[in-house]
Amino acid sequence: MIVTTTSGIQGKEIIEYIDIVNGEAIMGANIVRDLFASVRDVVGGRAGSYESKLKEARDIAMDEMKELAKQKGANAIVGVDVDYEVVRDGMLMVAVSGTAVRI
């Protein structure tokens, strides 16, 4: 499945706009608290284990969105947006959304 942040796919014609699709993943409070309170594993100015957790959450949200698009008969998603939000009790939510299309 093609997934892009752009409104179209170069060299491809969008045959049908199907629906808005999304996916979410929430990281536990202890991870978020540790993320902002401690950087014990910082290497070269980056916190590797936290980046790994954020990537994992983003991948889960993206997979959820792609599965929803597939269920709706789409073979691509355009206009994808990724948001990170701190929600109640210090939990972090990764939310992705886009438009499911058929090319």
UniProtKB/Swiss-Prot annotation:
Q: Which domain of life is it from?
A: Bacteria
What the entry lists under Pfam families is as follows: YbjQ_1 (PF01906)
Write down the SUPFAM superfamilies for this protein, in alphabetical order.
YbjQ-like
**Stored InterPro entries:** UPF0145_dom_sf, UPF0145_YbjQ-like
Q: Which family does it belong to?
A: Belongs to the UPF0145 family.
Q: What is this protein called?
A: UPF0145 protein BC_1012
Species of origin reads Bacillus cereus (strain ATCC 14579 / DSM 31 / CCUG 7414 / JCM 2152 / NBRC 15305 / NCIMB 9373 / NCTC 2599 / NRRL B-3711)
User: What phylogenetic lineage does the species belong to?
Assistant: Bacteria, Bacillati, Bacillota, Bacilli, Bacillales
